[in-house]
Amino acid sequence: MTLFNILIIGRSNVGKSTLFNRLLNRSTSIIDNNPGTTRDFKYVDFYLNGLLLRLYDTAGCDLLSPESFLQKDILHINENLLTDADLILFVVDSKNGLTSNDIEFAYYLKKYFFKTFLISNKHDSRKALEDFWEPLSLGLEYSFP
């Protein structure tokens, strides 16, 4: 049976682990308000409509300042996972708005990966509602606020 790899990726503290838990309908990943809670990747295999899926929760990565040893390691791991991904869920934080890291990441994903869905998370604040359409400026083909 074919295994389909789905990768949840984005910068730190955008809600990747929350999305992971919600998609699985259980608390599998640790969730915390402090950035950097997830330091490695986690995955769960499950069936959906007869398809075998592997859903990955990844550590947040900062493409623009990979100076720390941990950040370099995270970038390397995520890059390896990206090459095997059949679908990428790129999560951004609408509450705090897009960052230069989000823009750089979107450019990288558009250039090298075709099956990327943009997930605009944290729409529960006034600022997020005011800037509702901002994530669409990243130009990813599939976008979900």
Across the structure, where does each feature detected by a protein language model lie?
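Conserved G1/Walker A P-loop phosphate-binding module
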Residues: 1-69, 81
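Short glycine-/polar-rich loops that comprise or flank the Walker A/P-loop
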Residues: 4, 84-88, 112-116, 139-142
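Structural beta-sheet core signal
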Residues: 8, 90, 118-120
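Short, glycine/serine-rich, charged loops/turns that create anion-binding
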Residues: 13, 95-96, 123-124
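Switch II of P-loop NTPase G domains
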Residues: 37-40, 52-54, 58-108, 127
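Canonical P-loop GTPase G-domain recognition
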Residues: 114-117, 122-145
